[in-house]
Amino acid sequence: MKNEKKFNTALNLFILVGMLVAVVVTNVFKVQQPGARHFMLLLASVGAFTGVINTVLSANGNIWTFLFGVIDVSVATVVAFDSSIRTGGEPVWGNFALHAFYFLPMQFVGWWQWRKHGADSHKKVNARRLDSRQWLMMLSGMLIGITAGYIVLCKVAGFDISGTFRYLILFDAIVFVLNVLGQILMSFAFMEQWYVWILVNVFSIFLWSEKAMSSAESSYTVVMVIKYSFYLLNSLNGLRIWYALSRDS
């Protein structure tokens, strides 16, 4: 037990430091871009830092994840709103609406649900597992969501859906739907959320790797690959911890 606690502490510290370094380096690249708005970058950095803490606490079943989640999502909402005002782009407004009316309320739902399942400032949440009916509902919803998301993104991008299969747009749709699904499973304390977050990070690594091979800003994209690699490691750690938490429950 003592050795396991030391291992968990060391692994969490490694993941936390790795994520934070990746965030810092990412923002260094952004500051150097022409027309960079330093205040908004600083605000986004605060959100990114709290987001890192949020994910590590979530992996450990700590209810304070939602406090940092509220800060992270609130900052992301402000940044998305600012981008929408400046660009007027429909996808950006969609990002604002997603954060303001979905991810932000789900932080409070998560706090309430985790409290119902035994979590407090000293105790980890009593994690749950999906039953067969819930698995079927989740997979059906995921398939419908990805299909609808792919069609919408193709329309927004001006592509013919019946034309060449556009796998990068499909991956964008998959990541979007998995993020929505993962938040639901997280807020309701289901262990299976970590399967979803693992997929999110794997697809994100693939997408950024693809950009790294085709973009002139290869240094920035490589940093993003490293960043999501740490997120993937955190997801694997979360699966390990939550598997035990749900078994104990």
Which residues does each predicted region cover?
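Short, hydrophobic transmembrane alpha-helix segments
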Residues: 24-38, 56-61
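Structural signature of hydrophobic alpha-helical transmembrane segments
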Residues: 29-47, 95-104, 162-175
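N-terminal membrane topogenic signal
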Residues: 1-17, 132-137
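Helix-coil boundary and interhelical linker segments in multi-pass alpha-helical membrane proteins
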Residues: 29-33, 78-95, 155-164, 212-222
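Alpha-helical transmembrane segments in multipass membrane proteins, preferentially the mid-helix core
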Residues: 147-160, 173-192
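Membrane-helix interface "capping/anchor" motifs
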Residues: 54-68, 184-196
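Hydrophobic, ordered structural segments
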Residues: 71-117, 122-126
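C-terminal transmembrane-bundle signature of multipass membrane proteins
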Residues: 181-249
